[in-house]
């Protein structure tokens, strides 16, 4: 099978893309310490000989979780790896969209290879779950997975390799925060997806030996930087998710239910014969306006603080009304006539005001 070299590690192992099997494969040329979240030979291991990440399906469900572990073993064999001595993870993301980032400090090198998609499955830790999991084996969820392969050219004890996983996860969450990705299951900012996987590999023969992988240590810094940057690049490649595309009212407030479809229902109240295509045309002329985008960001933050108990209902409603008044003035409208007494009132008032602003800006 044809292999395309994507990257050569400092230990001379290659990260290769195998188009025929829709996979990224790494074969180790020396013993490694491996920490894997995979169902296939997961946990801490010192006998793993290779790794793969592969595109397991297209849009929609893949297979039952009950069959997934067995399936991973079969995939390993197809890729020329020993199923008993390899670990692998799957995703709906395309391997062509993988991002690789390396950071160095003196002799230390940390490289992250990431595939990522969040459009259908972004979630926040603590969101309502879809199943219990102790006995039931449901179908796999919507496409949307962040898979991270992290290489460290240093040695460390197993506990610190586990600590590196914590830092790696924080780096992933920082990337989602900087892109303002919201949960698809709640009103919370996303911290990951429901199916994320991580594999961390370090070199037991390296003269570099670390007893810390937290944020105060240079190793922790490099882990955070590589993972954060690689996750952001992979999301751009897979979902066309960039800072520029997130400069949008509906992206900032999507997790609070403010979408083009919802705003269209408000538009129909304003113009009963309005058609959806007309509304989309009107809205897209205002969705990225600086005033509207930043007001929506402030409102999202205000609603977050209210939900988290950092702001009381009365002060949240009072400040929301001031923000909405600023919006009205920015678009040449007189005032916000609604009485605002709750978070639902805040969202309702914003939707009505946003529709009026779009209509006014387009001269209707």
Question: Which residue ranges define each predicted feature?
Answer:
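Alpha/propeptide regions of enzymes that mature by internal proteolysis
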Residues: 1-364
């Amino acid at each position: 099978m044809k292999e395309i070299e994507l990257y050569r590690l400092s230990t001379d192992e290659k990260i290769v893309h195998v188009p025929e099997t829709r996979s990224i494969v790494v074969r180790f040329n020396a013993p490694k310490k491996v920490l894997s979240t995979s169902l296939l030979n997961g946990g801490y291991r010192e006998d793993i000989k290779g790794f793969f990440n592969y595109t397991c399906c297209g849009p929609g469900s893949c297979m039952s979780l009950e069959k997934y572990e067995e399936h991973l073993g079969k995939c390993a064999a197809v890729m020329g790896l020993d199923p008993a001595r390899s670990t692998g993870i799957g995703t709906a993301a395309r391997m062509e969209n993988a991002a690789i980032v390396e950071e160095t400090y003196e002799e230390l090198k940390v490289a992250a290879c990431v595939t990522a998609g969040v459009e259908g499955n972004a979630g926040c830790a603590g969101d309502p779950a879809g199943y219990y999991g102790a006995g039931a084996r449901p179908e796999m969820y919507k496409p949307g997975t962040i898979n991270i392969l992290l290489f460290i050219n240093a040695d460390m004890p197993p506990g610190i390799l586990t600590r590196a996983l914590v830092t790696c996860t924080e780096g992933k969450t920082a990337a989602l925060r900087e892109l303002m990705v919201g949960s698809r299951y709640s009103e919370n900012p996303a911290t990951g997806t429901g199916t994320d996987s991580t594999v961390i590999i370090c070199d037991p023969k390296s003269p570099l030996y670390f007893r810390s992988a937290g944020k105060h240590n240079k190793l922790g810094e490099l882990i955070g930087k590589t993972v954060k940057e690689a996750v952001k690049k992979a999301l751009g490649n897979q979902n066309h998710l960039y800072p520029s595309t997130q400069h949008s009212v509906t992206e900032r407030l999507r997790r609070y239910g403010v979408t083009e479809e919802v705003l269209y229902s408000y538009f129909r109240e304003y113009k009963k014969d309005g058609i959806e295509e007309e509304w989309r045309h009107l809205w897209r002329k205002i969705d990225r306006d600086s005033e509207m985008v930043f007001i929506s960001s402030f409102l999202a933050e205000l609603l977050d603080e209210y939900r988290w108990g950092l702001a009381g209902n009365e002060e949240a409603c009072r400040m929301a009304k001031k923000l909405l008044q600023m919006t009205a003035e920015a678009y040449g409208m007189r005032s916000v006539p609604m009485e605002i007494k709750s978070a639902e009132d805040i969202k309702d008032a914003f939707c009505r005001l946003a529709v009026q602003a779009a209509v006014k800006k387009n001269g209707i």
